[in-house]
Curated annotation (Swiss-Prot):
<comment type="similarity">
    <text>Belongs to the cyclotide family. Bracelet subfamily.</text>
</comment>
<keyword id="KW-0960">Knottin</keyword>
<keyword id="KW-0611">Plant defense</keyword>
<feature type="disulfide bond">
    <location>
        <begin position="82"/>
        <end position="96"/>
    </location>
</feature>
<comment type="function">
    <text>Probably participates in a plant defense mechanism.</text>
</comment>
<dbReference type="InterPro" id="IPR036146">
    <property type="entry name" value="Cyclotide_sf"/>
</dbReference>
<feature type="disulfide bond">
    <location>
        <begin position="73"/>
        <end position="89"/>
    </location>
</feature>
<protein>
    <recommendedName>
        <fullName>Cycloviolacin-O9</fullName>
    </recommendedName>
</protein>
<dbReference type="InterPro" id="IPR005535">
    <property type="entry name" value="Cyclotide"/>
</dbReference>
<dbReference type="Pfam" id="PF03784">
    <property type="entry name" value="Cyclotide"/>
</dbReference>
<feature type="propeptide">
    <location>
        <begin position="100"/>
        <end position="103"/>
    </location>
</feature>
<keyword id="KW-1015">Disulfide bond</keyword>
<feature type="signal peptide">
    <location>
        <begin position="1"/>
        <end position="9"/>
    </location>
</feature>
<keyword id="KW-0732">Signal</keyword>
<dbReference type="GO" id="GO:0006952">
    <property type="term" value="P:defense response"/>
</dbReference>
<feature type="disulfide bond">
    <location>
        <begin position="77"/>
        <end position="91"/>
    </location>
</feature>
<feature type="propeptide">
    <location>
        <begin position="10"/>
        <end position="69"/>
    </location>
</feature>
């Protein structure tokens, strides 16, 4: 039996959209005791995630048809856990989702 990975699983790194990245930065930056510049945070994230556009991720999600898992957070979790867990997302089927019923 053939096993088809979602399109984003073919990347060497997990992916994150600019909107998801901004949500993580807005949530995490106030928590640092020593304020890191956003550029430094972006460099760290860029080492573990690849920033991609929303249409690329949306196309991959449409092809895999995992819409029942919740609202996509704009990040994959094939190799690295969801950075967007800081804003309520969790990993399901290699994609970070937020349960729309959670507050």
């Amino acid at each position: 039996a053939a096993f088809a990975l979602p399109a984003f699983a073919s990347f060497e790194k997990d992916v994150i959209t600019p909107a998801a990245l901004e949500a993580v930065l807005n949530r995490k930056a106030p928590l640092y005791n020593i304020m890191m510049e956003n550029d430094a945070i972006l460099n760290v994230i860029a080492n573990v995630k690849t920033v991609i556009s929303n249409p690329v991720l949306e196309e991959a999600l449409l092809k895999t048809n995992h819409g029942v898992n919740g609202i996509p957070c704009g990040e994959s979790c094939v190799w690295i856990p969801c950075l967007t867990s800081a804003v309520g997302c969790s990993c399901k089927s290699k994609v970070c989702y937020r349960n729309s019923l959670d507050n």
